[in-house]
Amino acid sequence: MAVPARRTSKAKKNKRRTHKGLTAPGLSRDSETGEYRMSHRISPDGTYKGRTIIEK
């Protein structure tokens, strides 16, 4: 089996991992309540795009 010729340094390892960071969720302001919520999700009161989806 193949074995690495040299140990991978911390700098080389960290440079490879630069794209693995977390991203913030896509929040948008609700036009009816003014609260921030995730895009394309039903709001906590059960409405989506001005229509009632879930009766409370």
Swiss-Prot record:
One Gene Ontology BP term is: translation
One Pfam assignment: Ribosomal_L32p
Q: Which GO terms describe its molecular function?
A: structural constituent of ribosome
Keyword list (alphabetical) reads: Ribonucleoprotein, Ribosomal protein
Q: What are the start and end residues of every segment in region (Disordered)?
A: 1-56
SUPFAM superfamilies given in the database record: Zn-binding ribosomal proteins
Which regions are flagged for Basic and acidic residues bias?
29-38
One GO CC annotation, please? large ribosomal subunit
Q: Where is the composition biased (Basic residues)?
A: 7-20
Which family is it part of? Answer: Belongs to the bacterial ribosomal protein bL32 family.
* Listed name of the protein: Large ribosomal subunit protein bL32A
Taxonomic placement: Bacteria, Bacillati, Bacillota, Bacilli, Bacillales
Q: Which gene encodes it?
A: rpmF1
